[in-house]
Regions:
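Amphipathic alpha-helical assembly/interaction segments
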Residues: 1-98
Length: 98
């Protein structure tokens, strides 16, 4: 897979979130949503049409919104800021998925 900027940002964000302290219930949901972001970016990047790519990019954005909500409840300001930057990149991909 040819790496692209948003995908690289999602991998870095995933690594940076690993030390976040959460309850076991919140941790499970957080991990699933966090992992979904780069996985959907990777899968979407392999799709042949813009419409197909956008579907996966929107799913990644939805997963990031879940993560952002958990960060609002339990997280740190630096992680929230990093999530906002990633969200801006994802939003652009969703609306211009080439």
């Amino acid at each position: 897979m040819k790496p692209f900027r948003t995908y690289q940002l999602s991998l870095q964000f995933h690594r940076d979130c690993q030390g976040l302290k959460l309850s076991s219930i919140a941790r499970d949901q957080f991990e699933r949503a966090l992992l979904s972001i780069p996985l959907n970016l990777a899968e979407g990047s392999a799709k042949p049409t813009e419409r197909d790519r956008a579907k996966f990019y929107f799913t990644a954005l939805g997963s990031l919104r879940e993560v952002q909500t958990l960060l609002e409840l339990f997280g740190s300001a630096p992680l929230r800021s990093q999530a906002d930057i990633l969200a801006a990149h994802l939003y652009r991909l969703c609306h211009r998925p080439h």
